[in-house]
Amino acid sequence: MNVILGVTGGVAAYKALTLTSLMVKAGHEVQVVFTPNANAFVEKLPFEALSGRRVLDSHFDQQSDPIAHIRLADWADKVIIAPLTANTMAKLAYGMADNFLTTLALAYDDSLYLALAMNDQMYANVYVQENLMRLKREGHIILAPSSGLLACGHTGQGRLLEPEEIYSLCFEETKKDYFGKNVL
């Protein structure tokens, strides 16, 4: 299966490396795409070593392939964004395409798998919840964050699911109908 893994700029971005490894070990072709802020939290090289592909980001050379976002959206059997920050969630909810990942997501013609990760107060914010409901109504598959100790020191709902849980929900459970449902 051809999989796009979108990595956004949050502290939980390091977990995407394990998710990449799980997918590659299972025989999936994985193309990692970073948002500009992902670079502040994780390095590209480990993702490139595991996936065997160059990580694409907003600095992708559009001159060598000006419609790369369309080509990749057509190539992908599945698009997973893990972690999904409140910032990128808002962009997706309102159709903003200001970086390579959000542009690719708009071009993809199937449901996105969205694994949320953010501070508990951000997650509870009315605007974040409205964006979440909008994405659910559009048919995207929401992998809700778990509760526990967060990077900020708070305890609450906002932790990115463990990579093994994300993998299971995205691949082992694909026969179930998750259309517009909040998983977990």
Where are these regions (language model features)?
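A cross-family phosphate/adenosyl-ligand binding-site feature
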Residues: 1-113, 120-184
